[in-house]
């Protein structure tokens, strides 16, 4: 639908994109690792991966406390440049498109609550090829503060014309779960981004599934199924 449209549906599902619908979390970790190396910073890639899902500014501050603004901008620019070289390797997770279609077919508004850069989100949307199943989407341009702050979820809700009480959020990172919890939105977490079920549940996930296909197979009994009931 988009841009800027409100579909008039009374309930909806918000989806994170990277690591949730698109198999990209480890590519992001590698892109950040290379960006840090370019600045002479030796950051363990496992530590980087655990921060993927945060906004770039918060990821850098978490891994390199006290990093200057200039270096932070250089790191973000380098990450974007390196990540773009991985675009041809990106793939949607199995059944990601079908999951979006099933939610839309159940009469739910579907929003991509992504804080990705606009050009990265364009690539992801083309890969998903979900057409009219998606009612609204966001990018990093739509939020003042990045995850785990809930700004991007609130921006997506605004585009859908819904409130936090009307939706469920699906993500793959601890930061997704925390962002949802900050505004009282139930979070369904997927482990396909590389974070364990235990960590996601500890962060507050209401339900945990392996990947989009696993969630789709259990959609009727999930929090999403209850929304559409």
Task: List PLM regions with ranges.
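Short, flexible loop segments at the rims of nucleotide/cofactor-binding pockets, characterized by
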Residues: 86-90, 115, 186-187
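N-terminal helical cap/lid subdomain that shapes the substrate entry/recognition surface
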Residues: 6-106, 122, 130-131
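Asp-based, Mg2+/Mn2+-dependent phosphohydrolase catalytic module
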Residues: 1-11, 104, 117-229
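Residue-level marker of regulatory loop/turn positions in helix-turn-helix DNA-binding domains and
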Residues: 92, 113, 145
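Conserved phosphate-coupling serine/threonine residues in phosphotransfer and NTP-handling enzymes
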Residues: 20, 114-116
């Amino acid at each position: 639908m988009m841009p800027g449209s409100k579909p008039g549906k009374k309930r909806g599902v918000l989806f994170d994109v990277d690591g949730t619908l698109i198999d990209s979390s480890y590519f992001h970790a590698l892109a950040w690792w290379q960006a840090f190396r370019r600045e002479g910073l030796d950051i363990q890639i496992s530590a980087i991966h655990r921060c993927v899902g945060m906004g770039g500014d918060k990821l850098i501050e978490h891994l390199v406390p006290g990093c200057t603004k200039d270096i932070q901008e250089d790191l973000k620019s380098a990450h974007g440049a390196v990540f773009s070289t991985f675009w041809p390797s990106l793939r949607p997770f199995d059944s990601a498109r079908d999951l979006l279609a099933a939610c839309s077919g159940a009469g739910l508004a579907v929003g991509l609550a992504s804080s990705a850069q606009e050009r990265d989100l364009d690539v992801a949307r083309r890969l998903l090829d979900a057409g009219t199943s998606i009612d609204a989407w966001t990018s990093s341009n739509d939020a003042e503060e990045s995850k785990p702050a809930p700004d991007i979820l609130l921006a997506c809700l605004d585009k859908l014309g819904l409130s936090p009480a009307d939706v469920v959020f699906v993500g793959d990172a601890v930061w997704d779960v925390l962002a949802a919890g900050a505004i009282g939105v139930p979070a369904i977490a997927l482990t396909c981004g590389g974070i364990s079920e235990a960590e996601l549940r500890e962060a507050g996930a209401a339900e945990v599934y392996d990947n989009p296909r696993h969630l789709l197979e259990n959609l009727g009994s999930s929090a999403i199924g209850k929304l559409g009931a």
